[in-house]
A protein has these predicted regions:
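A short N-terminal helical cap/helix-turn-helix that marks the beginning
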Residues: 2-26, 44
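Conserved AMP-binding/adenylate-forming core of the ANL superfamily
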Residues: 26-57, 61-70, 74, 78, ...
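ANL superfamily adenylate-forming
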Residues: 31, 116-132
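Hydrophobic residues at beta-strand termini and immediately following loops
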Residues: 37, 90, 130
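Anion (oxyanion) recognition and catalysis
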Residues: 81
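Structured binding elements
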Residues: 84
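Conserved ATP-dependent adenylate/AMP-binding module captured primarily in the ANL superfamily
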Residues: 92-123
Length: 132
């Protein structure tokens, strides 16, 4: 693989995906008992999410990702970029004022959260006030 001929992380990922056995493990949870995802599973999930994201954004729109370190984070990150969006990942440990600043500064077209606990951290912030 000639990395210097690739233009993005998305191209690098899909090139690597084409080169490896699709059944080879790729992502797994740190918690016991959670599933492991192979290269084929991840590729399919990226394409499905990317297709949905493409219906919600225009090329170059920012897409915020609020998630813990988990397999779905990488899937969301690559899906956003594959859809033409700009991925804006944020930590789950920020203070409310940090979330408020980032939301207003980046003005995301969509926000992807990993679970309801993460959504609760931001859904009450002024950014979501449709009357302003």
């Amino acid at each position: 693989m000639e990395i210097n001929k690739l233009n993005s992380l998305v191209e690098l990922y899909f090139k690597k995906c084409d080169e490896v056995d699709k059944k080879k493990p790729f992502l797994e949870w740190l918690k016991p008992g959670k599933p492991t995802y192979n290269w084929g599973d991840v590729r399919e999930r990226i394409f499905k999410l990317s297709s949905k994201i493409k219906t919600l954004i225009n090329e170059g729109d920012r897409c915020l990702i609020l998630s813990e370190n988990r397999p779905y984070w990488l899937i969301a990150d690559i899906a956003v970029m594959n859809a033409g969006g700009i991925s804006v990942p944020i930590f789950t440990t920020y203070a409310e004022s940090d979330y408020n600043y980032i939301l207003n500064d980046c003005d995301p077209e969509i926000i992807i959260v990993s679970n309801n606990d993460q959504f609760k951290k931001i859904n009450h912030l002024p950014f979501f006030d449709v009357t302003s």
